[in-house]
Amino acid sequence: MQVIETLAEGLKREIKVVISAKDMEGRMNERLAEVKDKVRINGFRPGKVPVSHLKKVYGKSIMADLVNEIVRDQPPAILTERGEKSATQPEVAMTEDKDEAEKILAAEADFEFTLSYEVIPAIELKSVKGVKVTREVAEIGEDEVTEQILKIAESARSYEAKKGKAADGDRVTIDYLGKVDGVAFDGGKDEDSQLVIGSNRFIPGFEEQLVGVKAGDEKTITVTFPAEYPAKNLAGKEATFDITVKEVAAPGEVEINDELASKLGLESADRLKEIVRGQIESQYGSVTRQKVKRQILDQLDEMYQFDTPQKLVDAEFASIWRQIQTDLAESGKTFEDEDTTEEKAREEYRKLAERRVRLGLVLSEIGEKAGVEVSEDELQRALYAQLQQFPGQEKEILDFFRNTPGASANLRAPIFEEKVIDHLLTEVDVTDKTVSKEALLADDESEDKPAAKKAAPKKKAAKAEATEAAAEGEEAAVPKKKAAPKKKAAEDSAE
């Protein structure tokens, strides 16, 4: 077998592999000898079939199997021999000429194929002893814990029916029917709907017109759907709602005590406070983690500059761009609305994709050298977390991860990345700094976020930069969540 390098340009490689017809025939004869005693052909005793006859009957099919095995097994063997790692699955090109293919299968012509791939660049790791990061830690006061508990307590608040008029804060139970131009519309009808006046659950102007109603009242109110309302057929339209008031109920007092804790399934108010404080600490801890991670990645980005495999960049950019398109479609906006053009946005997000791939390769190399591994138990926990996100779709998700090549890598990559960050935090200089929650949650204006002034793209860019690339720089498709049930048309979905 001859292995000839025909292209070595940057990270691109092209290898020509030639296996002589004589070699292929020899392999075929070996395979025929293996099956000689096993085949049964009419007119011949077992084991007495001439090789020439076997070749006539089975030659082409065996040769086809050999070709498939060579194409499957040789590329990784060749890469290993060359000491190279391919960024993606190497592309294999063979002759498409039918006559030439027939000659190869008949062992009358050499079998040739070409491998095309991009190599993962060799990365010489640098010391991170000079990397300095500030770990912001927010203090959590009792007032904040109390405020959060009171918000939670709203779900357990009791209401008592009253005879008077509805006031702000009261809960009304109503039937309603919405119409546009006198015609009822989908999602505009409900019965026994409970609404707390002032909760701003419904579109602007709806709740305010319920102030003063009493049980038994029938009323028609007029509102205008917001211009940005998700349902295009209702956005900006004036609508009427025929309302029947069934009950008006006044809110009970909310107190943080053992009774409230009991309603929430806890043994005491102290335990409730402890849990809420822990939740707040966890939320702030996630922000702290992402900010520290961002600082590390920014400095690694400055330390490592090298060419990136374009196929990985293409895949990463495609993933980012799909999300940008989705964000714009959902917001009903265009690039022009965001003071940019598609060309400029593509350029910005292309740079982001290159950064993510480059950092992914760096983190992969750091992790490999540090002996970072992802355990089977960690993968199982990640899979369980996926299942929790898609209730009712457990079987489909399990089948997806079992049957989709690369799907498990999609679970492994973020775990691997976080473990590499954990490793780096033991190597870099970390300074803790106590800050207010406002300072912790404030956007870092120094971040080089693509489309920083663009509402929809900005959201994606911030998320992309915060999470960065998967350690291997590749993406694997994941099951999409089922769409959430549509809200009633009267409700304001501008969350």
From Swiss-Prot:
Principal EC category: isomerase
Domain PPIase FKBP-type residues, every copy: 169-254
UniProt KW keywords: Cell cycle, Cell division, Chaperone, Cytoplasm, Isomerase, Rotamase
Cellular component terms per the entry's GO annotation: cytoplasm
Subcellular location: Cytoplasm
Major subcellular location class: cytoplasm
Cysteine disulfide partners in this protein: none
Domain of life per record: Bacteria
GO MF annotation terms: peptidyl-prolyl cis-trans isomerase activity; protein folding chaperone; ribosome binding
Entry domain remark: Consists of 3 domains; the N-terminus binds the ribosome, the middle domain has PPIase activity, while the C-terminus has intrinsic chaperone activity on its own.
Known function: Involved in protein export. Acts as a chaperone by maintaining the newly synthesized protein in an open conformation. Functions as a peptidyl-prolyl cis-trans isomerase.
NCBIfam families, per the entry: tig
UniProt name for this protein: Trigger factor
Species whose genome carries this gene: Rhizobium rhizogenes (strain K84 / ATCC BAA-868)
